[in-house]
Structure formats: C-alpha cells, structure tokens
Regions:
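Non-catalytic interaction-recognition regions
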Residues: 1-447
Length: 447
C-alpha cells in the first residue's frame, strides 16, 4: 500500500490497508509466499509542504506566536511534537534562517516522524510491512533513468510533443514542449503519457514506472492497492509494467485493486473533523473507540471498489443487522454451548444427524473452495461474505431449537446425538476461526 507521509492515517487509508493485509493473509493461507510492501511517496511537492508546516511548529516550540496556520500548510496538532523535537535538536539555529538552509533537513526529519506515526497507526490494526520503499531513494539511485532507458530500447518511450488539452481552450501560458512520452496508446490509452515534466522532474507516472521496474525484478506477481481516485492511471501503469516485464523475458502478472473512501457517520450523521489531524478523523481515533477487529471486519463487508459508510453506533450494535456482531455471536454461542454441554463432541455417530444439520455441514464444507476462489480472484471480501452466510445458517439452526426442543444441540436424554451435534457445532466454530484468521480478526469465545 501507499499513502503520502504527511500526517496520520485516516479511514480512507485504513480501508486500503485492511484490504491489502487481508489479501496477503488470504494468499498465504492458499500457499503463496507474500511480501507486504509500503511505498513511501516522499519525493513530491507535498513533502516540501510538510517541511514548511513543521518549520511553523518548530518556531512555535521556540516560543513564537505563529497565529493561524496559513492556508496551504498542514494545520493538524500532530505536527506540534515534531516541532518540539526539532527545537530540542537544533535550538533556534533555523528559526530565522532562509528556507534553502533548512528545507531538505526538515523534509527528512518530518518524513521520518510521519512514518513512525504511520507504522504505529498500522500496528493498531495488526498490520506490519516487510519492506518500506522510498520514492526519494529510488530517484537518488537513478531508478527512473534505468526504467526510461529500458523502455526507450524497446521503442516504448520517445521524445514528442503533447497535443493541447481537448474540450476546452488551453491555458494562456500553454505552449508545446517536447517531452519523453510513453506509448500508452498502444495499450488502449487515449494518448501517450509523459514520464517527465517540462522542468525535468519526474511525473507521478514516471516515478511509478521506476518503482515497478525495481519491484518486478524480485517478484512472480505484483498487486497494488490504490485509492479509487487513481482509477484513470491503472490502464497505463499496467501497460508499462507489462512492457517492462515482458521486455526482461519475465511476464509478471500485475493487478491493481481500487479502494473507495469511507464515509464516517455517527447515528447517521456525518462525523466532524478531528482536532488532531485538522481535517479528518484519524485511524487511531476510530480503533480506540470501536476496536481493531470491528474496524478490520467492517472494512471487508463490501467490495473494496464500492462506496462504504462506517457508522460508529451501528458497528458496535448488538444486532443481527451488524455483521461483525452476528458472526462473533455465532462463534461465542458455540463455545458457550460446548462449555455447558457436559458431553464431549464426538464423530462416532454422525449418521444421527438429520437434514437440517447436513444443510449446515454443506454450508461449512464450502470453505476450502471459497478460499481457493477468493485467492484466485484476489478478493478477500469473499471470505467475509461466506462467514456471514455461515453465521446466518448456524443461527437459523440454533433458532430451530427454540421452536422445536428436539432440534436443540444438547439433548440430555440422548448423549450420542448431543455429541454428534456438538461435533458439528465445533467444526462450524473452527471454520469461523479459520476464516477470521485469514482476515486478521480474532474470534471471541465470550460476549
């Protein structure tokens, strides 16, 4: 996954992080070796904005009344500790210095502080990455130049002039400029795309090329988790990665999973902004209120490219309309029954099970096929959907005992049937535990 290192994680980042981590868990369960990687976007202009924002907080920590944070800078309180740390380290050495003297230094210190915060935020969700790749380090190592040279050799990058923007009058200062262009029209794009800007800096697309050029060297398959707002660039990056890997004699499958933002509600009303971030509710604030497992499972109750609402009241509601509660309640209900039964589960008399029990067996027995299909499709939400259906089937079986005492799991006058039903229930619980483990969620035994 990736997120700009300019502040704490918010719920849009959260959904992508959970989807990515759950996908990794799913692929590992299916037998793949997986490397979890975080791409640090630390080479763009937003990092300069971060450094300038940190400099404001640095001056504040030195006792200056900075007033309101100017528009265009990051206003959140999360930068106050960064400013205090800078003041402790450098004193007033850069308080009145020219920006050229401190910008690069403050960039480095600020990004390091933000990544420390981001790692801590992700840890709250049980997410730990194996590798962190820095965009700035890739550029310092001339990886973009290597990718460009490779693509030029294959005839996929050339020097050309972009057409004026279509459908509207071009800006007054627009003029045709020769740029290195990737032949993305050969792969279904509507125009060839520049990999460099007119000032010589790499475009986002050019930087992404370099990252994937390196990434593909050590992988048999690549999967990116992107925000849905980047959907327009998927086709061209897929084309570029295909060109890079096929040109190297290795056709590395590459997939991009798009994740929609999350709308936060409380009792149906939009949640106000966070003072800590200045603009959004942070992931840490959400996890602190409702818990890691609720957040993780809820993020997987819809397809990632579908819009999602996260209502603080509903996700902790003890109701069958709350999929998190309904699933955990099924698991806890089974364990409560096992504790109270006074009989050990047994598989010696499974022929005593009737049609209703066998229907539950068939539901649970789908699990291996669901895992295989979900892994093949790279869709961890299928596991969450399956678990919801299994929980509903178990609750239906349980409720049948309320109407007909002969359908209750525990039959005091028939220990053989009780043992068989307990065995069935214990296997349903095991499937629930396994499914939740894939998704990085802990199954509870008491509620």
């Amino acid at each position: 996954m990736t997120a700009n290192p300019t502040g704490p994680m918010h719920m849009g980042h959260c959904r992508g992080a959970v989807v990515g981590d759950a996908l990794c868990g799913l692929l590992e369960w299916a037998g793949y070796r997986v490397v979890r990687e975080y791409y640090v976007n630390d080479a763009g202009g937003q990092v300069d904005v971060l450094a300038r924002s940190a400099h404001m907080r640095y001056r504040e920590a030195l006792g200056e009344d900075i007033g309101a944070i100017p528009e265009g800078l990051y206003p959140g309180d999360y930068l106050k500790p960064v400013g205090e740390r800078l003041a402790q380290e450098f004193g007033d050495a850069y308080k009145d210095a020219d920006e050229s003297e401190w910008l690069e230094l403050f960039r480095h210190r600020s990004v390091a502080a933000m990544m420390e915060m981001i790692r801590a935020d992700l840890a709250l969700l049980g997410i730990h990455h194996d590798l962190f790749s820095s965009e700035a380090e890739l550029q310092a190592a001339k990886k973009p130049e290597a990718a460009e040279a490779w693509l030029r050799e294959k005839g996929l990058v050339y020097d050309g002039v972009l057409e004026a923007p279509k459908g509207k009058a071009p800006p007054e200062d627009w003029e045709p400029v020769e740029l290195p262009l990737f032949r993305s029209t050969e792969f279904g794009d509507d125009q060839d795309r520049p990999i460099k800007k007119s000032n010589g800096a790499w475009t986002y697309f050019g930087a992404d090329l370099a990252y994937h050029f390196q990434k593909a060297e050590n992988a048999d398959a690549l999967i990116d988790i992107w925000g849905a707002d980047h959907a327009g660039t998927v086709k061209r990056i897929r084309a570029a990665v295909a060109a890079l890997t096929k040109g190297a004699g290795r056709d590395v499958p590459f997939d991009v999973k798009l994740v929609q933002m999350v709308k936060l509600l409380r009792d149906g009303e939009p949640v106000k902004m966070s003072k800590r971030s200045g603009t959004f509710v942070t992931l840490a604030e959400v996890v602190e209120e409702v818990g890691k497992d609720v957040v993780r499972f809820t993020m997987l109750t819809r397809k990632p490219d579908a819009q999602m609402e996260f209502d603080f009241a509903k996700v902790v509601e003890a109701s069958k309309d709350n999929p998190v509660f309904y699933l955990q309640y099924a698991h806890a209900r089974i364990h409560s029954t096992l504790r109270k039964a006074g009989v050990e589960p047994g598989s010696d008399n499974l022929d005593r099970l009737g049609a209703d029990e066998l229907a539950l067996v068939r539901e649970a027995a789908q699990f291996p096929r669901v895992v295989e299909a979900a892994a093949k499709a790279r869709e961890p939400h299928r596991i969450a959907f399956f678990l919801g259906d299994l929980a509903a089937a178990f609750h239906s079986f349980w409720n049948a005992g309320n109407d007909d005492p002969a359908m209750r799991i525990i039959q005091e006058s028939d220990p053989e049937l009780t043992a068989a039903r307990l065995f069935l229930a214990s296997q349903v619980a095991q499937v629930i535990r396994n499914g939740l483990a894939i998704l990085g969620v802990e199954a509870v035994e008491e509620m």
